[in-house]
């Protein structure tokens, strides 16, 4: 580690994430982006792969000296704000945010290859290609892996790439998870509309409405809703 005038320590909470599936050391650095610029970046990179590439670019720019993932009490389900607390009982620390995330992902029984930021970093040669290539000190984390950790509903396998190209727009419209407002509990505060990068959300008569034809499925509304009344819905077959 080269000496620097400023020491950057990245402290993240291990969570599931509605858009990216997993949130740890790398995704946490999106927090350095000023508030109003976040929706702009979501709008500029509406698809998961380009967004993941942007997160890796950001990580390389910030270049944290040390990354810590708090996985003592993690969040499962529809994170990063609408999930439930789940005890894992671990702290992960590394000079590499990517390798910290590889271990963090394993703790909740996620394959690092499923996580797009790690896949992108591995393709660039920024971290180990496999978890077995990382020297892990301390407790044997294999003994504390939570195998029934609930994932975000939107992070299901993307089947749209498995159909013929001409059918993908229709398949995406049918199969892609989407935000659904519980209008009975919505208080019309407008926080979701403020956070929406595509300006698809309006508040009328103290109730929120989404214009789904313009929705890019970034789930910023789900993340920012202070009342947690915006849920992530998906094709019902995934729940069978």
Q: What are the functions of these language-model segments?
A:
Residues 185-188:
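Flavin-dependent oxidoreductase catalytic cores
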Residues 216-217:
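Extended, alpha-helix-rich binding/interface surfaces that flank or overlap catalytic cores
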Residues 181, 191-209, 220-236:
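Iron-sulfur cluster-binding cysteine motifs and their immediate structural context
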Residues 1-182, 236-240:
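Extended, low-polarity segments enriched in aliphatic/aromatic residues
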């Amino acid at each position: 580690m080269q000496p620097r005038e400023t020491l950057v320590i990245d402290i993240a909470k291990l969570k599931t994430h509605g858009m990216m599936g997993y949130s740890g050391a790398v995704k946490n650095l999106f927090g350095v982006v000023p508030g109003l610029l976040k929706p702009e970046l979501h709008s500029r990179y509406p698809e998961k792969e380009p967004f993941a590439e942007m997160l890796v670019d950001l990580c390389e720019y910030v270049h944290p000296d040390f990354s810590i993932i708090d996985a003592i009490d993690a969040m499962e389900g529809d994170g990063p704000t609408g999930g439930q607390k789940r005890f894992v009982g671990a702290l992960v620390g590394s000079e590499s945010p990517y390798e910290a995330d590889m271990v963090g992902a394993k703790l909740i029984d996620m394959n690092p290859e499923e996580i797009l930021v790690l896949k992108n970093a591995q393709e660039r040669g920024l971290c180990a290609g496999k978890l077995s290539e990382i020297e892990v000190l301390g407790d044997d984390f294999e003994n504390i892996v939570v195998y029934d950790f609930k994932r975000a509903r939107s992070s299901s396998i993307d089947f749209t790439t498995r159909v013929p190209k001409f059918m993908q727009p229709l398949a995406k419209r049918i199969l892609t998870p989407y935000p659904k407002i519980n209008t009975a509990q919505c208080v019309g505060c407008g926080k979701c509309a403020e956070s929406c990068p595509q300006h698809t959300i309006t508040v009328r008569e103290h109730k929120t409405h989404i214009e789904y034809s313009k929705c890019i499925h970034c789930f910023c509304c789900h993340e920012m809703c202070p009342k947690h009344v915006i849920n992530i819905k998906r094709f019902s077959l995934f729940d069978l």
